[in-house]
Structures are given as structure tokens and as C-alpha cells.
Amino acid sequence: GIDFTHPDFIDSLGNTKVMYIWDQTIGSPTNTPANFSYGEEWDSTDINLGVCTHVDPSSYYGHGTNVSAMAASNGNATNSHYGAAPDANLIVVASNFNSANWLGTIADAVEYIYSKADSMGLPCVINISAGTYGGSHDGLDLDALRIDSLMKAKTGRALVCAAGNAGSHAAFHLGYDLSADTSFTWFEFNSSIVIPGYAPSGCVY
């Protein structure tokens, strides 16, 4: 999410730098984005008119606001703290981390953002400062392949993501060839796990 009322996201004329917000956490939406059937969408007109009801979830300590400012703060709040691209506008997706198909919703977010950027005729860099220890981490799962395809579909598209911030807590297993070996992994946090299998046909077992 994002605190779109922060001065660093408002230009010199008093208009928002946030072009769109898609809040995927809204359970009973009244305005879902085109091509998607969940979450609530607002545009810059809604924000400027004061009818956007999106709230940056306090449970995530303003994380979305922080990373948005690092990317595109115009420095209005203090005239000293600027983002990497202070003249850039923002398209924000508030992720639902409790979704049963969280990675799928991330791929939806990528499609949504690139589509909106295309409609404005602008290049686009997507920042995903989030991650998971689940999955293969080899870029071959369906959601990763979908994101890769979206990114490569047109020029002027880029995507950056967090490389991990677990520090010395190695809560993941590094993959290697098991064709002639046995792997034993102890999972610290759960008494049971579900391991999906991906067939070449695309089926998930």
C-alpha cells in the first residue's frame, strides 16, 4: 500500500503523483480493475477529489510508502529527500499476502501495471520489494514464466525485486541435482508442507 497523502507524492500544483491504486486486499469491491475480478481500483482523479479510501496497512509498517518514496519521492516534504526518479509517477498495487494464490496475484499486479503504463504511453519499471521462501526459485514456475513473458513482451519494461533480507537465518534449501543422491530438509516453522510438482505440460500436482 501507500500513504498517497504524503507531500512527497503530491506535485507543486497539489495533484497526486499516484496515477492508479489497485488494492487487492479489499474483500467486497465496488470497482474492480478491467480484466480482473477482485480488489478495488482508484485513479488519480479519485485521489485528487478525496474519494480514494485506500489505507496503507499499518501491519506492514509503511513498507509500500517507504519503497515508493525511494523510487519516486519529489522531496516536497523536506526539500531534501528525493527518490531515484523524482519526476516519475506511480502505479501502486497493495498486495494481499494472505491470498491462497499470492504469487498469482503478484503476476496479476505486473500485468496490471504494464497495461496501465501502456495506456499512458510510458515506459515502466516495476519494483517488487517482497518475496517468499516457497517455490523453486529457478524461474520455471508458471507465475515466474508469466511475469517473464510480460516483461519481454515490449520494450521499455523492466522489473526489479528484493534479493532477500533473511540475514544469517537460512530459512531456505538450496537446490541441486538429486538424480544420484538423497536430500533431507528440516522445516523449522511448520509440522507439514505441501510440495507442488510442475509437469512439462503445465499441470500442477
Predicted ranges, named:
Residues 1-104, 121, 154, 158, ...:
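Subtilisin-like serine protease catalytic core
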Residues 5, 96-204:
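Substrate-binding/access-modulating region of protease and related hydrolase catalytic domains
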